[in-house]
Swiss-Prot record:
It is found in: Cell membrane. The keyword Transport applies. Disulfide bonds: none annotated. The keyword Protein transport applies. Belongs to the ABC transporter superfamily. It is a peripheral membrane protein. This is Oligopeptide transport ATP-binding protein OppF. Its EC number is 7.4.2.6. InterPro entries: AAA+_ATPase, ABC_transp_ATP-bind, ABC_transporter-like_ATP-bd, ABC_transporter-like_CS, Oligopep_ABC_C, P-loop_NTPase. It catalyses: a [peptide](out) + ATP + H2O = a [peptide](in) + ADP + phosphate + H(+).
Length: 308
């Protein structure tokens, strides 16, 4: 199904280590590979410290990778410099996890949203600039009265909408949403996700949606990658990963998702993942268990998974 679609982002055998050579070095990404196809939402899920945010930042070249290659529209991101890097920044944007920290508290909303327009010279004059900002506010469900306010005057959900408007201002092809709802109240989370889904369908955007909530990732994503200890352990369609998880870590994540039905919640069996198998020294690689469903496994483990 995905083979005939255009690859927008290709992550190939990427590794990244922080504090390399020091006593406190951390291998944040360990030989990770995946593709993101044009027009899809690729969900990346895992617990805190799994490396999912680091992957997102590496794709935007906010971190320099140690090994491997990241391509965007066929161009290697690590080789981009000067004008080519400047143009890439316009095509790929990020929605940050903390809407409060990611907005300049001393700038008005009008200027926050218009900053990308100014940097990339996408407007001709002040009237054009104001009209464009107003259109973006309308798009995310805010109004013109908000233009002259500061970030601290808004709720968390409204601030995240401002962050979304800022990301959309330069008309990107690709947006990395780094846990965009984790800092929001539960009642607001669905509103923001529905807004992102609506904008994605209307504008043909491609998302990398990073989160730790598997049920929310399933709701918005076409395909899901599951990360643990810097490695991707499972990739498949959202339905396959959610309803037919194969890797023990994915199964443990899903077993922790609460059930709204109290009867089912009492019957739910929690699966505790034992990572000791990952430390046995054996080489593991992504292997296709069912069509389009890949799991990090040895050859023997893959055979066992296929029999289940």
């Amino acid at each position: 199904m995905t083979e005939n679609r255009k690859k927008l982002v290709e992550v190939k055998n990427v590794s990244l280590t922080f504090n390399k050579g020091k006593a406190n070095q951390v291998k944040a990404i360990d030989n990770v590979s995946f593709n993101i196809y044009e027009g899809e939402v690729f969900g990346l899920v895992g617990e805190s410290g799994s490396g999912k945010t680091t992957i997102g930042r590496a794709i935007l070249k906010l971190y320099n990778i140690d090994k491997g290659e990241i391509d965007f529209e066929g161009e290697t991101i690590s080789k981009l410099k000067g004008k080519s890097l400047f143009n890439f920044r316009k095509k790929a944007q990020m929605i940050f996890q903390d809407p409060q920290a990611s907005l300049n508290s001393r700038m008005k909303v009008r200027d926050i949203i218009a900053e990308g327009l100014d940097v990339h010279k996408l407007v001709k004059n002040k009237a054009d600039r104001d009209a464009k900002v107003q259109d973006l506010l309308d798009l995310v469900g805010l109004n013109k009265d908000h233009l002259t306010r500061y970030p601290h005057e808004f709720s968390g959900g409204q601030r995240q909408r401002i962050g979304i408007a800022r990301a959309l201002a330069v008309e990107p092809k690709f947006i990395i949403a780094d846990e965009p709802i984790s800092a929001l109240d539960v009642s607001i989370q669905a509103q923001v996700v529905n807004l992102m889904q609506k904008l994605q369908h209307e504008q043909g955007l491609t998302y990398l949606f990073i989160a730790h909530d598997l049920s929310m990732v399933k709701y918005i994503s076409d395909r899901i990658g599951v990360m643990h200890w810097g490695k991707i352990v499972e990739i498949g369609t959202s339905d396959e990963v959610y309803h037919h998880p194969i890797h023990p870590y994915t199964q443990s994540l899903l077993s922790a998702v609460p059930e709204p039905d109290p009867v089912l919640e009492r019957q739910r069996i929690h699966k505790v993942y034992d990572p000791v198998d990952e430390l046995d020294g054996q080489e593991r690689e992504m292997r296709e268990i069912t069509p389009g469903h890949f799991v990090l496994a040895t050859e023997e483990e893959a055979k066992a998974y296929k029999k289940k």
